């Protein structure tokens, strides 16, 4: 697998582009997470960045990638509505792992948004999507542009939801290469990695949370609920960051 140029890839016919990505993904599927990170850092364009929601398993990807690129910018899109435990977890991991944390927020404050639009998360799917566009998608797009990102690492896993079940290791999203090093990991592998390296789950894991986002759209997992139903009142699984 040689160096990849996004411009050259985008210049290909759609069928050729799809075939090229499929060929490299076939090889990446057989590699370990560490090997995927190493390959991406060697062959994909700079600037490499890593996004994190600092959720339940966040420490895995943060350690995995920063072990090979200690100063990689770590992008957090802060909505202003994260749990207090999340903010403390961010501080803890930033200090423990020496993260180069880059925080991006909406251009309008949470209070001003509520004054202007009301509580968007209580306005059905349309309101949730508008909220996510303002507080997650636009700040992420701005982060990628500001940092000059060419390669984007993220910690998604196929096991997490139906919407992620068929994601490839490598794709093109928002005009950059996107690599998912632990896409094929299961919960057991996450646990083993955290234990082996003395890292912790998000503090709310012990209280029954399987997925953690904003305080107003995250629920503790109850008997009979799927992980997908604990976010956005079960109306959506994705916040928009990893779509499109």
Curated annotation (Swiss-Prot):
Q: What does this protein do?
A: Catalyzes the formation of sulfite from phosphoadenosine 5'-phosphosulfate (PAPS) using thioredoxin as an electron donor.
Looking up NCBIfam families in the UniProt record yields:
cysH, PAPS_reductase, PRK02090.1
Q: Chief subcellular site? A: cytoplasm
GO process annotations (BP): hydrogen sulfide biosynthetic process; sulfate assimilation, phosphoadenylyl sulfate reduction by phosphoadenylyl-sulfate reductase (thioredoxin)
Q: Which organism is it from?
A: Sodalis glossinidius (strain morsitans)
Which GO MF terms are attached to this record?
Answer: phosphoadenylyl-sulfate reductase (thioredoxin) activity
UniProt entry keywords in alphabetical sequence: Cytoplasm, Oxidoreductase
Q: Provide the gene name from the record.
A: cysH
Q: Give the signal sequence positions.
A: none
The reaction(s) annotated as catalysed by this protein in its Swiss-Prot or TrEMBL entry are: [thioredoxin]-disulfide + sulfite + adenosine 3',5'-bisphosphate + 2 H(+) = [thioredoxin]-dithiol + 3'-phosphoadenylyl sulfate
- Pathway(s) of this molecule: Sulfur metabolism; hydrogen sulfide biosynthesis; sulfite from sulfate: step 3/3
Write down what this protein is called.
Phosphoadenosine 5'-phosphosulfate reductase
